[in-house]
Regions:
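Short beta-strand scaffold segments in enzyme catalytic cores
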Residues: 28-36, 95-98
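Short glycine-rich, polar/acidic loop-and-turn segments at beta strand-coil junctions
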Residues: 35-37, 46-47, 69
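Short Pro/Gly-enriched beta-strand edge/turn motifs at strand-loop
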Residues: 11-18
């Protein structure tokens, strides 16, 4: 797809904005990757809930990537059992995703293993309902907030990672 100047946040944002505009309502997942050299790639497996990276020849270590979550598949956050573990495995520096309602970002996960993530996630699961109650969220909104809070709380337990979510 091209190459960008890694020191130009404006250039990266222009690619990202075009990507969001083009794939915001797609029925399949698509991912835009900017590797550590600035090479830009577009990936899809034509699947609604994942991108198969098996035969992909891109160095993800140190990369920035963003992918869409089709409306029928969104959890209003990253999937804690696929997106985050893949990030930990491949060394992605910054991972973003978006759905029809939110955009989310996870970074600074260097040094966290999948085993540590699974343990923190397990502990965090026990806290989701009480955190929702503490924040005054209605349990009828569980689907919209559960994964968001789970990832946020897992990062807090690990003392690693910066996770944010904002409305589009």
């Amino acid at each position: 797809m091209g190459r960008i100047n890694l020191n130009s946040e404006a250039e990266r944002n222009a690619y990202v904005d075009r990507f969001i505009d083009e794939y915001g309502n797609a029925e399949y997942e698509y991912m835009l990757v900017v590797d550590s050299k600035g090479d830009v790639s577009l990936l899809t497996s034509k699947l609604p809930d994942m991108i198969d990276m098996t035969d992909v020849d891109i160095t993800m270590k140190g990369s920035y990537n963003i992918h869409n979550h089709p409306a029928a598949e969104t959890q209003f956050s990253f999937s804690d059992d696929m997106d985050v573990p893949y990030m930990l495995d491949d060394g992605t520096k910054i991972m973003e995703a978006f759905d029809y309602k939110y955009r989310y970002r996870l970074e600074q996960m260097d040094g966290v293993t999948k085993e540590q993530w699974v343990e923190a996630r397990s502990q965090a699961e026990e806290n989701v309902l009480s955190i929702m109650q503490d924040r005054g969220l209605d349990l009828s909104d569980y689907e919209e907030y559960a994964k968001h809070i789970l990832i946020e709380e897992s990062c807090r337990i690990l003392g690693k990672g910066v996770y944010t979510r904002w409305k589009r």
